[in-house]
């Protein structure tokens, strides 16, 4: 049960974050959120959740799929991207990509558990002696990925890297739950690093 509980709460963990010490452009007013790889449905879900999490009254975020529809494994035309950024006046772009995705399978051996004996009564003794619980071994599969998120200012023609965050992400039950946890971790760090203002309560 302990193993199952640990798996249930395991989730994305921030490995590192970096903020450009030379950046002094202030808060962003219009941010484009772009997920580079993965299935289209998962990209859209990630973009939607991150947009909702980082949008503020002082600056709003937008999912890229509202402007660029990409089937799976379709690259982005950089000329189109430049035109989009210029036409829509985006002052920042958040780019997320999965840099590593591994599936590991390990064997978790069974365990024998016996409650401490209680000899005061027959029923106590009997119930303590016989309910020896055996948990059979099982194969445990974990999907582990690394997600890199970069935020660029568009003030310069080729963009300027302002912030980077890298997470190790453990799939927790479903893709949707994993995305939700990932977005929460990223948003917390973006606030901590003063890239976006804290959410008003």
Where are these regions (language model features)?
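Hydrophobic h-region of N-terminal signal peptides that target proteins for export
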Residues: 2-10
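C-terminal/domain-edge helix-coil "capping" segments
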Residues: 9-29, 130, 134-201
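Short low-complexity stretches enriched in small and charged residues
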Residues: 16-21, 46-56, 119-123, 193-197
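N-terminal segment of the mature soluble domain
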Residues: 30, 36-105, 162
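Short, low-complexity, polar/charged sequence segments that are solvent-exposed and flexible
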Residues: 50-55, 83, 113-116, 166-171, ...
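Glycine-rich loops and low-complexity Gly/Arg-rich segments
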Residues: 56-60, 86-90, 118-123, 172-178, ...
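Surface-exposed short loop/turn segments
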Residues: 75-151
């Amino acid at each position: 049960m302990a193993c199952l509980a640990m798996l249930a709460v395991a989730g994305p963990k921030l490995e590192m974050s970096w903020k450009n010490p030379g950046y002094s452009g202030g808060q962003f007013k219009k941010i484009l959120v772009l997920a580079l790889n993965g299935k289209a449905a998962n990209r859209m879900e990630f973009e939607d959740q991150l947009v909702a999490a980082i949008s503020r009254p002082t600056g709003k975020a937008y999912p890229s799929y509202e402007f660029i529809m990409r089937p799976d494994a379709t690259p982005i035309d950089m000329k189109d991207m430049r035109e989009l950024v210029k036409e829509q006046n985006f002052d920042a772009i958040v780019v997320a990509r999965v840099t590593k995705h591994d599936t590991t399978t390990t064997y978790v051996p069974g365990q024998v558990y016996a409650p401490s004996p209680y000899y005061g009564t027959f029923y106590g003794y009997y119930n303590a002696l016989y309910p020896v619980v055996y948990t059979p071994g099982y194969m445990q599969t974990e999907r582990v990925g690394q997600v890199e998120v970069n935020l660029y200012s568009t003030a310069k023609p080729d963009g300027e890297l302002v912030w980077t965050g890298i997470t190790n992400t453990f799939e927790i039950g479903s893709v949707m739950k994993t995305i939700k946890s990932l977005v929460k971790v990223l948003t917390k760090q973006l606030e901590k690093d003063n890239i976006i203002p804290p959410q008003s309560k």
